């Protein structure tokens, strides 16, 4: 019965209905089909239970830290630092865009926040330097997917919560894949810069100038160091680390850099609360949906179907990569992880894939899906920021998506890329 709902589910998402309402609508339908439709309290009880979690508290705190950093002019300091390091290269601003995304990832962990904050600053600057608007928007969207891969990462917190994995292990496992995505984009830019004669932004900076730019960016760059250092050192949990990050961002904005005023704090908190509420509503709805799907025994049927395709884990991983890539185009990474993680995760663990490795495969696939046509969310954000049509950006982003797809398969078939750091530090076994 459930298989008939899948095309309808995708159709509703494609026509633009909010994911939250689609999930709840199907929750109600499936609840009724399972003869539990008369229990009206089950809806809000499942939503509440879905978000009543200590690990999920990290999401609003990391959102707040990102908003504080952005409002406090931190993005500008990161751009200036990146420009001092890479602005002299051909295609300098495109390289700066990617490097800034990698640095910003350590502050916000959000692809949407990355696209909005960096795009509003660099897309106009790139246009002035002679880049086409569609290229500037495309590289901004393509590099923004690094945000949820390099820690801290909201979707990895959700995965750890749903699957019972270590948040610290997932954070550490995302470092090298995130850097690999960034480097692959820079290599692509290098070849495109030669072909299209992209300009450099500045002459090569002196070590003195780089030192000054590094000092200006020092406090923002310390944020991921504090987060990961505190977790690795056993000083605080990932959830406590998120609160420390928010407090640190507020402190340096108000008292060290003095780029933030007290009167701005309520606005920052309101915006962070609004963004967090959207994420947590999606998580709650997806958890409710997952509960009723499990009642229909769909996970068991799907597991049998997947294992029936092949007993070769390499072939199955190839097929699942394609599935997750497609799912990521239409469904936000958080709900997708909640719905598909408990179904697919145990299958691949049984086939010998390490659970942390599969978490990274799934997270990177779904994250790249955010920038994939036709429905990738960050494409619409990039369109809104740049004023360029989504269709035009979608064509311009294809070379970058091809490179990111190659990286996904490297991560999939070479586990050491994601597993070396968590294994060496003892957070994965």
Where are these regions (language model features)?
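Alpha-helical transmembrane segments of multi-pass membrane transport proteins
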Residues: 1-429
């Amino acid at each position: 019965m459930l298989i008939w709902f899948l095309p309808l589910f995708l159709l509703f998402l494609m026509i633009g209905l909010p994911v939250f309402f689609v999930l709840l609508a199907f929750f109600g339908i499936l609840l009724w089909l399972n003869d539990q439709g008369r229990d009206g309290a089950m809806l809000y009880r499942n939503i509440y239970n879905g978000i009543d979690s200590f690990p999920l508290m990290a999401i609003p705190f990391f959102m707040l830290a990102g908003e504080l950093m952005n409002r406090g002019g931190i993005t500008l300091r990161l751009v200036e630092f990146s420009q001092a390091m890479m602005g002299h290269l051909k295609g300098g601003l495109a390289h700066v865009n990617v490097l800034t995304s990698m640095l910003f990832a350590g502050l916000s962990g959000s692809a949407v926040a990355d696209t909005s904050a960096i795009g509003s600053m660099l897309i106009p600057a790139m246009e002035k330097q002679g880049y086409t608007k569609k290229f500037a928007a495309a590289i901004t969207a393509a590099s923004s997917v690094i945000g949820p891969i390099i820690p801290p990462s909201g979707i990895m917190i959700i995965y750890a919560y749903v699957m019972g994995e270590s948040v610290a292990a997932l954070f550490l496992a995302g470092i090298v894949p995130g850097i690999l995505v960034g480097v692959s984009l820079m290599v692509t830019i290098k070849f495109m810069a030669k072909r299209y004669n992209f300009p450099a932004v500045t002459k090569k900076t002196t070590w003195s100038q780089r030192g000054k730019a590094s000092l200006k960016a020092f406090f923002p760059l310390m944020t991921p160091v504090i987060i990961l250092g505190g977790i690795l050192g056993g000083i605080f949990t990932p959830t406590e680390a998120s609160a420390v990050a928010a407090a640190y961002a507020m402190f340096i904005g108000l008292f060290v850099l003095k780029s933030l005023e007290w009167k701005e704090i309520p606005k920052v908190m309101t915006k962070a609360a609004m963004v967090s509420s959207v994420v947590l509503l999606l998580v709650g709805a997806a958890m409710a949906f997952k509960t009723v799907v499990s009642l229909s025994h769909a996970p068991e049927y799907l597991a049998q179907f997947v294992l029936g395709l092949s007993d070769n884990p390499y072939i199955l991983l190839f097929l699942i990569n394609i599935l997750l890539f497609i799912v990521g185009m239409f469904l936000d990474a958080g709900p997708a992880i909640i719905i598909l993680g408990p179904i697919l995760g145990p299958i691949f663990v049984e086939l010998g894939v390490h659970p942390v490795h599969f978490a990274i495969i799934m997270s990177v696939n779904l994250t790249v899906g955010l920038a994939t046509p036709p429905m990738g969310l960050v494409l619409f954000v990039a369109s809104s920021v740049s004023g360029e049509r989504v269709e035009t950006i979608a064509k311009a982003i294809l070379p970058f998506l091809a490179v990111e797809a190659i990286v996904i398969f490297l991560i999939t078939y070479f586990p050491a890329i994601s597993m070396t750091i968590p294994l060496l530090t003892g957070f994965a076994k």
